[in-house]
Structure formats: C-alpha cells, structure tokens
C-alpha cells in the first residue's frame, strides 16, 4: 500500500484535509483583502478613506457596522454568505447555485442581459470565480433562497430586493461601496461567525399591525364603542368641573384642545368668565347710579333728620353712606384686568406646553399598546435592528 493510500485509509484524515482547505481559503481571502486595499483607487487623495469613515458613521447611527470581505471579484457572494451562514467560505457554492437558478428561470433574466452578449455566455462568465456579479445575481439569490436582500449605500435610501412576498421574511443586509464592492453589514457588537439576523423597521411595522389586528379580533374589541365611551367620559368630567350643560360647547372645546380635559376646562372657565364680565359691564353703570342715588339721599336725609331723630339712627345712615363708596371701589376693582399681557402670554405658553405634553403622552400610550408580543424570546429581540423606513424596491 502506498503512502497516499495509507493516508486516505487513516481515520480522521478527511477532517484534517477539510480543515487545511479552510485555513488555506482564509489565508487567500486575507491576502486578497490586503491586496485590494493596497490597489484600491484613491481619487482626490484620501477620498476612499473619507468614504469609508462616513459609511461607518452612517451605519453606527443605526447600531450597525461593516464586516469587510476581500475585493477579489467574489465579494457579493462572500457578503451574502456571511449574512446567510456566518462566514464567506462557501462563496463558490453560492455563486454556482445562483447561476443554476438563473438558467432555470431564463425567461425572467434573459431580457436584462446586455444586447450584445448572449445569455449562455453571460451565465457561463458569471459561473467563473472572480467574475463581478450585479443586480441580476442578487435577485436570483434572493428568489432562490426565498428571502429579501437589503442594500446599504452612503447617503442614499435603502434598496430592498424582494425574493418573496411572504410575511416575516428573513433579510440579508449588505453594503455597496466605491461603486464596485460589496461588504457584509452586522450589528455593531457582533463579532461572531453566526448567521446575521437583521430586520428593518419597515417589516416590523407590518408585523405589529398584523399582531394588533389579531389581538383586537380575539378580544372582540369594538374600537368605535371605546372611542365613544372616552368622549362621553371626557364631556362628563368637563361639565362637572365647569358647571357647563351645553354638550356641543363642551365637545367643541375638547376638539379644539385635542381632547385634553384640563385644557378644555380652562378654556371653558375663561369663556364663562368673559361672559360674566361682559354682563357686569352692561349692567354696572345703572347699578352704580342707583347705588349712588340712594346713598346720597340717605346721607342727606340723615343730616336733615338728625335733629328730629335719635343719634343712633343718624349714625346708622352715616355708616351706610360711608359703606357705599367701598362697595363701589370693590366692584370697580373686580372689572380691572386680572393679568397683564405678559402674564397672559406666559399662561398661553404654559397651556400650549401642557397640550403638547398630553399629545406626547397619548402617543406613548398608543405605542405601548401596540408593542410587540411579550412572548417573543429575548434572543429574537437581540437579533432585531431598527433601520430607516425609506425604501426603494428593485424587481426583475
């Protein structure tokens, strides 16, 4: 038996060979990445470095980071493999599977091949390692694996290439840089070789809406009845606090104050106070004349009859004559403006601030009521990342 045959027959030799191939592939990837960085075009001096820093800052704001892959022509399949499996060692397999899918679905992809290149030549070239792959390969990969691919670009909205219309679809996030290179996108603290599980806020909104509808169906909640009860309760509280019995007036004030009960009560009290002041102003001149006339007559009669009547009666009428100016002064003060313009503006500012706080509180309650199911495991929550909601869809 030769040495080669003996080596093949030894137990565990296949595992060592696979490990050696894996290490060789990793070394080749590192060398290719270093070479790509050295040979990367640098228009305008440090333009590429600035682009990388800007891209990193953009992703960091979303809680994400770049995981670079070698720019050896296999970068797209390396980045997709890192997202799908946690590493990029199977990029050749992903490339071949993508090409095979394009051949099977030729009628979908042939119209998008350049006119002067036959489809057979295009897929034959794409199947070779190191051939740059474009959007048609991303669409084929997404459809073949029944998932969505989200592409990040610097200072641009996200592109979502949908491989399926099913809900709760897995997403692979990659970055397109320098106009020719793809990298993998990971959570900012993810340094593992586990598959990436990123989910955009766009998809979370659809899931939350579906979950909320399902909850409402199961609980039998009638939204209209609930809103009607809330309005009636608010009207009752405002009416009890202000003494107002005009239902329409209360509802108008509630609507004007965005159903802020405290603000509506304040507004109604101000309206009632203004109405009362107007009534006092309309009736007060006549009342003052009436008060002044009898007071003077009583004072005069008190002086005229002081000799004929007892001293006590004179004192009583004199005291009444003295009391009427005090009452007149009190009534006059009650009609003076209670607050200055500055105080009124400050009061309006505080009321506006209260209304804004109430609106924020209502929004917070809505968000809390529409939160995700508490039954979702903590591991699943750790794999969620909230991203921007701006999307453009690329469909072939």
From Swiss-Prot:
The modification N6-acetyllysine is found at residues 65, 121, 128, 219, 290. Disruption phenotype: Knockout mice develope worse obesity, dyslipidemia and insulin resistance than wild-type mice when challenged with a high-fat diet. GO terms for cellular component: cytoplasm; nucleus. Residues 229-269 form the UBA-like domain. It catalyses: Thiol-dependent hydrolysis of ester, thioester, amide, peptide and isopeptide bonds formed by the C-terminal Gly of ubiquitin (a 76-residue protein attached to proteins as an intracellular targeting signal). PROSITE patterns: OTU. CDD domains: OTU_OTUD3. Gene3D superfamilies: 3.90.70.80. One of its GO terms (biological process) is protein stabilization. Residues 64-188 form the OTU domain. Residues 126-136 are annotated as: Variable-loop. Residues 1-49, 275-381 are annotated as: Disordered. Residues 176-181 are annotated as: His-loop. Residues 16-41, 280-301, 312-331, 343-379 have a biased composition (Basic and acidic residues). SUPFAM superfamilies: Cysteine proteinases. The UBA-like domain has no influence on ubiquitin hydrolysis. Deubiquitinating enzyme that hydrolyzes 'Lys-6'- and 'Lys-11'-linked polyubiquitin. Also hydrolyzes heterotypic (mixed and branched) and homotypic chains. Important regulator of energy metabolism. Glucose and fatty acids trigger its nuclear translocation by CBP-dependent acetylation. In the nucleus, deubiquitinates and stabilizes the nuclear receptor PPARD regulating the expression of various genes involved in glucose and lipid metabolism and oxidative phosphorylation. This is OTU domain-containing protein 3. It comes from Mus musculus (Mouse). The lineage of its organism: Eukaryota, Metazoa, Chordata, Craniata, Vertebrata. The gene is Otud3.
């Amino acid at each position: 038996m030769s040495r080669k045959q003996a080596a093949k027959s030894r137990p565990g030799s296949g595992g060592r060979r696979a490990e050696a191939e894996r290490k060789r592939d990793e070394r080749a990837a590192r060398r290719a990445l270093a070479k790509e960085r050295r040979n990367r075009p640098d228009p305008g001096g440090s333009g590429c470095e600035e682009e990388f820093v800007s891209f990193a800052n953009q992703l960091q704001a979303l809680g994400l980071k770049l995981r670079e892959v070698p720019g050896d022509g296999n970068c797209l399949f390396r980045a997709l493999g890192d997202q799908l499996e946690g590493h990029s060692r199977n990029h050749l397999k992903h490339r071949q599977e993508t090409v095979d899918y394009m051949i099977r679905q030729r009628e979908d992809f042939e119209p998008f091949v350049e006119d002067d290149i036959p489809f057979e030549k295009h897929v034959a070239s794409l199947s070779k390692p190191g051939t740059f792959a474009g959007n048609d390969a991303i669409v084929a990969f997404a459809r073949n694996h029944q998932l969505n691919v989200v592409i990040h670009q610097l200072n641009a909205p996200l592109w979502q290439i949908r491989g399926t219309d099913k809900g709760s679809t897995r997403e692979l996030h990659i970055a397109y840089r320098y106009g020719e290179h793809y990298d993998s996108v990971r959570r900012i603290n993810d340094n593992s070789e586990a598959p990436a599980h990123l989910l955009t806020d766009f998809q979370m909104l659809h899931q939350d809406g579906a979950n909320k509808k399902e909850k409402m169906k199961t609980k039998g909640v009638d939204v209209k009845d609930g809103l009607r009860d809330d309005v009636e309760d608010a009207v009752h509280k405002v009416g009890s606090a202000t003494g107002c019995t005009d239902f329409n007036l209360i509802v108008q004030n509630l609507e004007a104050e965005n159903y802020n009960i405290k603000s509506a009560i304040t507004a109604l009290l101000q309206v009632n106070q203004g109405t009362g002041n107007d009534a006092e102003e309309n009736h007060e001149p006549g009342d003052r004349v009436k008060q002044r006339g009898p007071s003077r007559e009583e004072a005069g009669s008190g002086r005229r009859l002081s000799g004929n009547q007892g001293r006590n009666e004179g004192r009583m009428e004199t005291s009444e004559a003295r009391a009427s100016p005090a009452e007149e002064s009190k009534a006059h003060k009650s009609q003076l403006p209670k607050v200055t313009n500055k105080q009124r503006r400050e009061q309006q500012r505080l009321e506006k601030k209260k209304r804004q706080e109430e609106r924020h509180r209502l929004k917070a309650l809505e968000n809390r009521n529409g939160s995700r199911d508490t039954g979702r495991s903590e591991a699943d929550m750790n794999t969620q990342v909230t991203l921007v909601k701006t999307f453009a869809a690329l469909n072939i």
